[in-house]
Amino acid sequence: SKYPSTNIQIEVFKNQIEIIKKSNYSFNNPDNFKEEFDIPKLNKEVLITIDDAFQSFYLEAWPYLKKNKIPFILFVSTEPVGRRGYMTWDQIREVESKEFAFIGHHSHTHNYLIDETNDQFILDIEKANRIFVKELGYIPSLFSYPFGEYSKFMRDYISKNFEFAFGQHSGVIDINKDKFELPRFCLLYTSDAADECDS
């Protein structure tokens, strides 16, 4: 697969979900996450995020999430949509039509944007914005930095144009976290995979 360090086998994924349930965590709906971010939580909650909109997600994880109505954010990079190994816009719209499924912004190219100029970065985001409006009718308000990497300029630009942004550094989200540098934990490819998430 393209990014093996952040992929997960479907049976391992299902097992992780069951562990979360048995540990008395609830699944946070992204709408509630946005509205209640500044409110301290008494209960343990998990927000599921999925990057890249691979076809494998649609064929394997999506049926399970749909059956169980588990809320999640699917972060989409607009350039690869419809290419080999990636979901189509029709499939993305199908997912997005469910009230528990949310589409997030993951740039246009999914390049290492931190290595590009500030102008190139802005052009990439703006191109994705135009495609999102054409295909979905809106620009997603949640952003995920490609490869979890960002500069101060990128963070500041995203903060002016989105509601929240996620990296790939590990950590628990609480009200003291920067809304545009939110951490995430990886659900890893196999149960004994390495602990580091690097792509």
Cite the ranges covered by each PLM segment.
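Short secondary-structure boundary segments
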Residues: 147, 168-170
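Extended catalytic core of nucleotide-activated donor transferases of GT-like folds
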Residues: 29-30, 56-60
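Short hydrophobic/aromatic-enriched beta-strand-loop microsegments
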Residues: 70-75, 162-168
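N-terminal pre-catalytic segment of deacetylase/amide-hydrolase enzymes
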Residues: 1-46, 199
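Conserved small/polar residues in nucleotide/adenosyl-binding loops
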Residues: 189-196
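Short, electropositive alpha-helical surface patch
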Residues: 125, 154-166
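Noncatalytic alpha-helical scaffolds and linker/capping helices
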Residues: 51-53
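Metal-dependent polysaccharide deacetylase catalytic core of the NodB/CE4 family, i.e.
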Residues: 1-4, 43-46, 55, 66-153, ...
